[in-house]
Regions:
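NAD(P)+-binding Rossmann beta1-loop-alpha1 motif at the extreme N-terminus of oxidoreductases
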Residues: 1-68, 130, 179
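Short amphipathic alpha-helical segments
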Residues: 19-20, 43-44, 121-123, 149-151
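Rossmann-like NAD(P)-binding element
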Residues: 34, 40-41, 52-136, 144
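Structural signal for hydrophobic packing residues in well-ordered secondary-structure cores
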Residues: 43-57, 110, 131, 153, ...
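Rossmann-fold dinucleotide-binding core
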Residues: 136-215
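Substrate-binding/catalytic subdomain of NAD(P)-dependent oxidoreductase enzymes
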Residues: 177, 203-245
Length: 245
């Protein structure tokens, strides 16, 4: 199934970026938020992203070294068309407090909430009875594994991870990680969605906290500490256990 309606749960730094990028790429996007206070914190992020995208496109038109692959391909770049897509994304992106209303016709729900296990479980338990049969759920969690939450979604076969890097309009990678009950069909659909929002989809077939990129980064940090002779200051053995767990 090709997705049209996307709901992002959470309007933090990455949640707002994911929502704006999907809207920029033509999807109908709603950000579900828990309170009026959340709207007050999220709207300025959306305002800032609009300006960031405009500035990035202007720089791309002047300097190929400033290219943002999440915004356009070099061989088909049209500055005015890209700027129009930014305006459309900003105008059409919706913020919603009513969860039932937000997900009523959702093809994909992207959970991008704080890394708190209890809060995520409560969210999934509230979400589950409200979803249409068609809806696929993904989590953007960077440290908590999808298998921890699959049973609370009510649709473990349609649940997996979709993890983004910060500044996704230029760092355009998306790591797609399954858990034991994920159906291959929905893995493929989410891979396609990642491509549709101009991400490079990186399949992760085994659950791993940190996914691919963070795991690689952690190893590099560890080696750098060794090279700089900082073993004693950072208690290297303890750090090693933490990084590779």
């Amino acid at each position: 199934m090709k997705y049209s309606n996307v709901v992002v749960a959470g309007g933090g730094v990455l949640g707002s970026q994911i929502a704006f990028q999907a809207a920029y790429c033509g999807f109908n996007v709603t950000i579900w938020l828990r309170s009026e206070g959340s709207i007050g914190r999220t709207q300025p992020k959306i305002d800032h992203l609009k300006q960031t995208y405009i500035e990035a496109i202007e720089k791309m038109a002047e300097d190929k070294n400033a290219w943002c692959a999440g915004l356009a391909d070099e061989d088909t770049f049209d500055k005015e068309e890209c700027l129009k897509k930014v305006e459309n994304a900003y105008a059409n992106l919706k913020l919603e407090l009513d969860m039932a209303k937000a997900v009523a016709d959702a093809d994909l729900v992207i959970e991008s909430m704080a890394e708190n296990e209890k809060d995520k479980i409560a969210f999934y338990e509230k979400l589950s009875p409200l979803l249409p049969e068609k809806t696929v759920i993904v989590t953007n969690s960077s440290t908590l594994l999808p298998s921890m939450f699959a049973k609370y979604t009510g649709r473990p076969d349609k649940y997996l991870s979709l993890h983004f890097a910060n500044s996704i309009w230029k760092n355009n990678t998306a790591e797609i990680m399954t858990q034991a009950q994920t159906d291959e069909k929905y893995f493929n659909e989410v891979m396609q969605f990642a491509n549709d929002i101009r991400m490079i989809g990186l399949p992760v077939r085994k659950e791993k906290s940190g996914y691919l990129l963070n795991s690689m980064q952690e190893c590099l940090i560890l080696k750098a500490l060794i090279l700089h002779g900082l073993e004693e200051q950072v208690h290297l053995k303890a750090l090693s256990r933490y990084l590779i767990q």
